[in-house]
UniProtKB/Swiss-Prot annotation:
This is Collagen alpha-1(I) chain. It is found in: Secreted; Secreted, Extracellular space; Secreted, Extracellular space, Extracellular matrix. Signal peptide: none annotated. Residues 62-76, 922-936 have a biased composition (Basic and acidic residues). The modification 4-hydroxyproline is found at residues 23, 26, 29, 38, 41, 44, 59, 74, 80, 89, 95, 122, 125, 131, 140, 146, 167, 176, 179, 206, 209, 221, 227, 236, 242, 245, 260, 269, 272, 284, 293, 308, 314, 323, 329, 347, 356, 362, 368, 377, 380, 389, 398, 404, 416, 425, 434, 437, 455, 472, 478, 484, 490, 496, 502, 514, 523, 534, 546, 549, 555, 561, 570, 588, 603, 630, 636, 639, 648, 654, 681, 690, 702, 708, 717, 726, 729, 750, 759, 768, 777, 794, 803, 806, 812, 827, 833, 839, 848, 854, 874, 877, 880, 952, 955, 973, 988, 994, 1009, 1012, 1015, 1018, 1021. Glycans are attached at K98, K937. Transmembrane segments: none annotated. Type I collagen is a member of group I collagen (fibrillar forming collagen). Expressed in bones. Belongs to the fibrillar collagen family. It comes from Doedicurus sp. GO terms for cellular component: extracellular matrix; extracellular space.
Amino acid sequence: DEKSAGGISVPGPMGPSGPRGLPGPPGAPGPQGFQGPPGEPGEPGASGPMGPRGPPGPPGKNGDDGEAGKPGRPGERGPPGPQGARGLPGTAGLPGMKGHRGFSGLDGAKGDAGPAGPKGEPGSPGENGAPGQMGPRGLPGERGRPGASGPAGARGNDGATGAAGPPGPTGPAGPPGFPGAVGAKGEAGPQGARGSEGPQGVRGEPGPPGPAGAAGPAGNPGADGQPGAKGANGAPGIAGAPGFPGARGPSGPQGPSGAPGPKGNSGEPGAPGNKGDTGAKGEPGPTGIQGPPGPAGEEGKRGARGEPGPTGLPGPPGERGGPGSRGFPGADGIAGPKGPAGERGSPGPAGPKGSPGEAGRPGEAGLPGAKGLTGSPGSPGPDGKTGPPGPAGQDGRPGPAGPPGARGQAGVMGFPGPKGAAGEPGKAGERGVPGPPGAVGPAGKDGEAGAQGPPGPAGPAGERGEQGPAGPGFQGLPGPAGPPGEAGKPGEQGVPGDLGAPGPSGARGERGFPGERGVQGPPGPAGPRGNGAPGNDGAKGDAGAPGAPGSQGAPGLQGMPGERGAAGLPGPKGDRGDAGPKGADGAPGKDGVRGLTGPIGPPGPAGATGDKGEAGPSGPAGPTGARGAPGDRGEPGPPGPAGFAGPPGADGQPGAKGEPGDAGAKGDAGPSGPAGPTGPPGPIGNVGAPGPKGARGSAGPPGATGFPGAAGRVGPPGPSGNAGPPGPPGPVGKEGGKGPRGETGPAGRPGEVGPPGPPGPSGEKGSPGADGPAGAPGTPGPQGIGQRGVVGLPGQRGERGFPGLPGPSGEPGKQGPSGSSGERGPPGPMGPPGLAGPPGEAGREGSPGAEGSPGRDGSPGPKGDRGETGPGPPGAPGAPGAPGPVGPAGKSGDRGETGPSGPAGPAGPAGARGPAGPQGPRGDKGETGEQGDRGIKGHRGFSGLQGPAGPPGSPGEQGPSGASGPAGPRGPPGSAGTPGKDGLNGLPGPIGPPGPRGRTGDAGPVGPPGPPGPPGPPGPP
């Protein structure tokens, strides 16, 4: 079973070995036996029962060489045994204790060679003897020592990015924002003449929403416009739908108050006018100060549980390997396709209230005008065209305060949404280019090799215990797959133990659940403005009954300039702005967590011929044969049986530490989806400060090297194939006869370096790294040349905007320190069995077998010709040769996932406040005029040129996290971090097939003469 860790499959510990399976079928017959001794002369007698082993005879005199005996024919093949019944699936056992190191088999004592006996007459050919009994399987020889460590391999190419995860669930709505301040009532202006209704304007396209600006200083109040003359009553208009509030234009300079016009006659009440079209798109406001970071989102739901994979055959537990050296930094990975956008989160909490703007300077008081007669209020007429601003009027007395303006609708600022659900696991990346072989690790001690039991169903994973010794027994058939257990916590790092015998590779399991949510990183820069549209205006009420026409009043006095009106409703959200410029390069992040060890690659090329092996133990005593006369040295016997496979090579050292990956921008909380293509951000500025490099992925243990045939140089790791179940054990060969001792052959030279293996699949991505340090503050932008824009008509005050888009990112931060090595990861999957190595050098001859009983005396035969001296039978398989030269360094591992982005850089400097416009004289307050209908929205004013940059503003509260920006270019390589802890030993691979038959050993030295045989019976007359 696997637990999720940030979307990374972490293999759980292997289940314990199941019970011993039933014995398999008998093996195939062994190779041809050695040449038998010459038969005794004379008619063969009936085979007598096997007698007890007799004492060795006294040494005899040197006899003449006898004729070479004919080789005996091979024994007949025994019938195959019945197939054993399939073993029942074993129940999961407790984790076994670590097994003791097995003792090497002792060499059998070599018998003393007896002196050669007198040369007897050549014997007649003997009958073919019955096939000898199958001897017990010899003990494995002492394991060869692994070679010295080679340089670390270079990093392999990065795998393709996985598919994006599904969007997370929508979070709960946040609390409502702060209510807007009540606007001061404007002074009543003089009643203007009603203008004729203008044509309905064309509805403008909604503009993209500008980022919410921080509360800026209050501008100087503009001058009131000159009241227009009252127009004639228009015909009742058709009731229109409520219009959208137009964007607020820049405040124009205050013009002088115009003289009050004469009050017009009250017009007939007009019908409600048509709703005005949407106003032109407003210019985006300045970037707002970042709000405080939102609370951490809820933890994402646990992903769907993967289907349990078939239970692999458990291999014997291996001993822990020695520590590996740190791998080289990895190269940058290619950004994957952009994942689908997650569901929109709830609005974040309301940002802090902006500081109040500076109060406008009061204008000089004008002379009070004469009070005019109050006219009857007329019915509201249709909207008049907006006239140009009139000349500045004289300042009058301030009028009475008007009623408070209607409170604008506050936009709801919600909290950040909960963490989205974990995405589906991405597809495995493309297979990378094969890396050169890794360095050979230190030799592990021999473990006790046992036969494997059938796999039991997977039980619940416990704490990882010490490796237990391999259980004996033949390999049973695999049991049905049990339900996957919960993954246990990784065990503490233990002292590297002895290397055990390799086990078969298990099938690769399904991808596990996503991991637990990581620690909340520092808040990122403010995100783009939400796309919640403001509410529409309410429907216009029905027109009231027309009032009685009033009498013509005297012209009123010129009114005072009105106060600023209440804030208007916000306009609809505009289209998304163009993409901002590419952000500055991010600073390199910390080292990623040590990645999981990739699967073991295919076996490397066959190693060079190994050194001559030690002599094997003495075989059991064969049946006592009839003793013949000593013959001449026989012809070379047939090749001996193939030796056992050599011990597994030492585990390779982990690769060197990877290069620091690029810092990724901070994404929303939750498991990182694959990096999307650099989409056009909103009206986003430079990319936020680069985030820290992800922590180094947890290092997996080095995979166990498959058994080499003879120890050659270590081949490169290749991709992991799904290991099939091991085949049934082959039949034990019949024991051949013992040949004469061969001479010690020369030691083989080290093998040539084999070509690198095919690339392995990319490993799982590491967990997101810890946050890096904040970037340095950004440099102020160039000073713009301000040019006063055309004054637009004042619009209604907009509502408080949403938090602004993040400001430009600061300069890239300096490279962070190397991260400490990650915790040891679980063992990687086992690789396929290694290929058989090349034949080893001829081994030293084994110890002589037990002495047979003395044979019956044969009659002396005629003296034969001296046989030719030939090579003796092959010796026992040689021990593994010395390790070959270390291969070139492999490429470094895959780059870890992009870590969360670092904190946002400090806010850029605020722009300088523009110069205040000239204050016009205050006009006389006129009579309160009738309330006119809503005017047609004016044209959008031209945006002014950028003003000079102001001094840096104080950093605002941190805003909610923004969307992840595109990944910056790759930072410089970080310095090598400290080596991580040793990875756990990988499971040993299955034993490879036996290597080819060893070379026939050179002829051994002629042994001393054997003891003389007793005189034979007299020959026939």
